[in-house]
């Protein structure tokens, strides 16, 4: 009886081992099949020469963004005074009506008292804001805010999801045409909890190498499926805009960093692709355009671009966390996590932040 049980136990172990090994091979097979040579050729085939089409360009007070199938002209409504002494430029993509969140960011990570890299002048932080075409009073308030704080770029682009790719290209164009000193450019959304001082060791140890053609952030490997409308989801891409079934590798959109060299190449590459007018600007810019011009895509540590990827109670370091925290929660999380999840942060408390928390 015991021998029978032992034999049965051995068989069960062998079955478990077989299942584990088979699952491993199946997973490996799936991963190797996600992005094939056919997929790569499809993406390359979408690229168009367009030698007769003008580039995306800054004309001084106006600028032009050119894609293969559509070209748009915009105006710089307000430009901040930029002192050429910062090597890093962070630009927050901000909705025009989010006055409260901009003030929260000014009091938290954008404040020199909270970020030594900003206090030392090594980093400059600005907002990029569009307009609301149906609300002239709101636009007037935005322009007044820009004059008062001096940290806003305002353009006459309608602030909505369909224009995200235009807005990000505008961000990159400003960075390479209106400034000279920054050799690292960061694009960040206003709902990201960010600790700028965490960049210092990453730059110092060459994890981020500003002399290369590179982008850095949370990387998704090639093979993510394209939604061509099969499941009636909110965000779909027509096959006329992009016919391929999967995307190349790309960086998650809420926060990523580009060397100046990479940003320049990406801006120059826009005219070679059709405009994709849905909320996949990260794929479009860091995946397709960056891939077209040979930009290296790099994974950075301490990046959490999915809300569930981390929480307030874990012990991992944080550089950037895309979180849904409301204004008061954002302030509290920034202050508490600064103490235990940001080794590079200054330890001094900010009296302005304490006052804001009390309100």
UniProtKB/Swiss-Prot annotation:
InterPro entries membership: Glyco_trans_31
Glycosylation sites: 73, 163, 209
Cytoplasmic side: 1-11
UniProt enzyme class: transferase
Disrupted-gene phenotype: Worms exhibit resistance to the Cry5B toxin produced by Bacillus thuringiensis. This is thought to be due to mutants having reduced population of glycolipids which are targeted by the Cry5B protein.
Effect of residue 106 to Q: In ye31; resistant to Bacillus thuringiensis crystal5B toxin. Susceptible to C.cinerea galectin Cgl2
GO cellular component terms, semicolon-separated: Golgi membrane
Location within or outside the cell: Golgi apparatus membrane
Pfam hit, one: Galactosyl_T
GO BP field: protein O-linked glycosylation; response to toxic substance
Lumenal topological domain residue ranges: 30-359
Signal peptide limits: none
Pathway assignment: Protein modification; protein glycosylation
UniProt keyword terms in alphabetical order: Glycoprotein, Glycosyltransferase, Golgi apparatus, Insecticide resistance, Membrane, Signal-anchor, Transferase, Transmembrane, Transmembrane helix
Entry's EC annotation: 2.4.1.-
Major place of residence: Golgi
GO MF assignments: acetylglucosaminyltransferase activity; glycosyltransferase activity
Spans through the membrane: 12-29
Membrane topology annotation: Single-pass type II membrane protein
Function recorded in the entry: Transfers N-acetylgalactosamine onto carbohydrate substrates. Involved in susceptibility to pore-forming crystal toxins in conjunction with bre-1, bre-3, bre-4, and bre-5. Involved in resistance to the nematotoxic C.cinerea galectin Cgl2.
Family: Belongs to the glycosyltransferase 31 family.
Protein name in the entry: Beta-1,3-galactosyltransferase bre-2
Species annotation: Caenorhabditis elegans
Source species taxonomy: Eukaryota, Metazoa, Ecdysozoa, Nematoda, Chromadorea
């Amino acid at each position: 009886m015991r021998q029978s049980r032992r034999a049965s136990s051995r068989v069960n172990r062998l079955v478990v081992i077989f299942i584990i090994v088979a699952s491993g091979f199946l997973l490996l097979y799936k991963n190797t099949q996600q992005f094939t040579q056919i997929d790569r050729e499809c993406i390359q085939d979408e690229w168009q020469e367009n030698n007769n089409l003008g580039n995306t360009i800054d004309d001084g007070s106006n600028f032009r963004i050119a894609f293969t199938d559509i070209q748009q002209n915009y105006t710089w409504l307000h430009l901040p005074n930029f002192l050429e002494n910062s090597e890093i430029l962070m630009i927050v993509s901000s909705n025009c009506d989010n006055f409260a969140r901009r003030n929260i960011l000014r009091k938290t990570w954008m404040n020199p008292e909270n970020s030594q890299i900003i206090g030392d002048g090594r980093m400059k932080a600005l907002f990029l804001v569009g307009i609301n075409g149906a609300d002239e009073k709101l636009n007037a308030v935005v322009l007044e805010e820009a004059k008062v704080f001096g940290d806003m770029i305002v353009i006459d682009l309608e602030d909505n999801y369909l224009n995200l790719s235009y807005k990000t290209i505008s961000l990159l164009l400003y960075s390479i045409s209106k400034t000279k000193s920054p050799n690292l450019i960061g694009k960040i959304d206003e709902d990201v909890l960010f600790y700028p001082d965490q960049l210092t060791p990453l730059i110092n140890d060459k994890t981020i190498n500003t002399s290369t053609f590179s982008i850095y952030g949370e990387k998704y490997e090639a093979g993510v499926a394209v939604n061509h409308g099969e499941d009636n989801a909110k965000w779909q891409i027509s096959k006329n805009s992009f016919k391929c079934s999967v995307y190349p590798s790309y960086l998650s959109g809420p926060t990523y960093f580009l060397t100046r060299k990479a940003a320049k190449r990406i801006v120059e590459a826009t005219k070679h692709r059709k405009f994709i007018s849905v909320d996949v600007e990260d794929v479009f810019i860091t995946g397709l355009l960056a891939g077209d011009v040979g930009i290296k895509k790099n994974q950075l540590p301490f990046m959490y671009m999915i809300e569930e990827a981390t929480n307030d109670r874990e012990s991992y370091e944080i550089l950037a966390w895309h979180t849904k925290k409301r204004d008061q929660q954002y302030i509290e999380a920034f202050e508490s996590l600064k103490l235990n999840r940001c080794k590079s942060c200054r330890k001094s408390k900010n009296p302005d932040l304490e006052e804001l928390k009390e309100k």
